[in-house]
C-alpha cells in the first residue's frame, strides 16, 4: 500500500493496481494548488468522509476525468448519483468488499453540509483493509469512545488523524485517539490549511514521541509505503 498526502485531508492510496483518492481538496488549498495538478491524479474510487467543501471540492472534476466511483454516505452518494456519477452508498457500521479490499464506514463526530448548505448526511471515517495492510482514515472528528471499537475488528498498521484543533481534535486528543485505536503510527491531517488550524510541527511530533508514538507530518506530494 502506497499513501500520498496532498494537503488537508486529501490522500491517494495505491492498493495493488487500484487507485483510491480520499477527500480531494486541492484547487482551493493555497498549500497544494500550485504543487498538484488534479488532471494528473489517478482514481478508480473517490472516498468522501463528509460534505464540507474542504473535502469534496475537486471530487466532481476528478470523477469526470477518471470515471471513478464515488463512495460515501447515503446522502452524499445520492447527491452525486443525481449528477450522473457512478456511486456506492454506505452508512455507519456497514462494510463492503471492493476490488481493492474491505471498507468499513465508521462514526465521526463532526457536521456535514454541502457548500450550498444542503444536508450532507452524517460524517464518517473509513477503515480500509487492503493488500494485507490496514488503515483508518478518521476524517474530521472529535475524540470519541467509538474509536475503541476499531481494534475489536481490525488491527491497524497506520491511521490518519486530524490534529489541527478548533474544528477537530487537537494534538492531545489525537494522542488519546491513537491509544483508543491501538495504533502508534499516525499521519497527521487537517492542519495548517488556514489560520484556525495552524500547529507547531516540532511540538506536535515531540508530544507524540514522548508517548512512544510516531507522528508523520508529510509534505505535499510526499509518499510512504506500508
UniProtKB/Swiss-Prot annotation:
Q: Which GO terms describe its molecular function?
A: hydrolase activity
Residues annotated as transmembrane: none
Q: Which family does it belong to?
A: Belongs to the UPF0173 family.
Q: What is the lineage of its organism?
A: Bacteria, Pseudomonadati, Bacteroidota, Flavobacteriia, Flavobacteriales
Highest taxon above the source species:
Bacteria
The cross-references to PANTHER family, in alphabetical order and at most eight, read: UPF0173 METAL-DEPENDENT HYDROLASE MJ1163, UPF0173 METAL-DEPENDENT HYDROLASE MJ1163-RELATED
Q: What is this protein called?
A: UPF0173 metal-dependent hydrolase GFO_2312
One family name in Pfam for this protein: Lactamase_B_2
Tell me what organism the protein belongs to.
Christiangramia forsetii (strain DSM 17595 / CGMCC 1.15422 / KT0803) (Gramella forsetii)
**Gene3D superfamilies of this UniProt entry?**
Ribonuclease Z/Hydroxyacylglutathione hydrolase-like (3.60.15.10)
Q: Which NCBIfam families match?
A: PRK00685.1
Which keywords, in A-to-Z order, does the entry hold? Answer: Hydrolase
Amino acid at each position: 500500500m502506497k499513501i500520498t498526502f496532498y494537503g488537508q485531508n486529501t490522500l491517494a492510496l495505491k492498493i495493488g493496481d487500484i487507485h483510491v483518492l480520499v477527500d480531494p481538496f486541492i484547487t482551493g488549498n493555497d498549500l497544494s494548488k500550485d504543487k498538484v495538478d488534479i488532471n494528473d491524479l489517478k482514481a478508480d474510487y473517490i472516498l468522501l468522509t463528509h460534505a464540507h467543501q474542504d473535502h469534496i471540492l475537486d471530487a466532481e472534476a476528478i470523477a469526470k476525468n477518471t470515471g471513478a466511483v464515488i463512495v460515501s454516505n447515503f446522502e452524499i452518494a445520492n447527491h452525486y448519483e443525481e449528477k450522473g456519477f457512478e456511486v456506492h452508498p454506505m452508512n455507519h457500521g456497514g462494510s463492503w468488499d471492493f476490488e481493492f479490499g474491505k471498507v468499513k464506514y465508521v462514526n465521526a463526530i463532526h457536521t456535514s453540509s454541502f457548500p450550498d448548505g444542503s444536508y450532507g448526511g452524517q460524517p464518517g471515517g473509513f477503515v480500509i483493509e487492503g493488500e494485507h495492510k490496514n488503515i483508518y482514515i478518521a476524517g474530521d472528528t472529535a475524540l470519541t469512545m467509538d474509536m475503541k471499537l476499531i481494534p475489536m475488528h481490525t488491527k491497524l498498521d497506520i491511521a490518519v488523524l486530524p490534529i489541527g484543533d478548533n474544528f477537530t481534535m487537537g494534538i492531545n486528543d489525537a494522542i488519546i485517539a491513537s491509544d483508543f485505536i491501538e495504533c502508534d503510527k499516525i499521519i497527521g491531517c487537517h492542519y495548517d490549511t488556514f489560520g484556525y488550524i495552524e500547529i507547531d510541527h516540532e511540538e506536535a511530533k515531540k508530544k507524540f514521541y514522548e508517548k512512544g508514538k510516531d507522528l508523520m507530518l508529510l509534505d505535499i506530494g510526499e509518499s510512504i509505503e506500508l
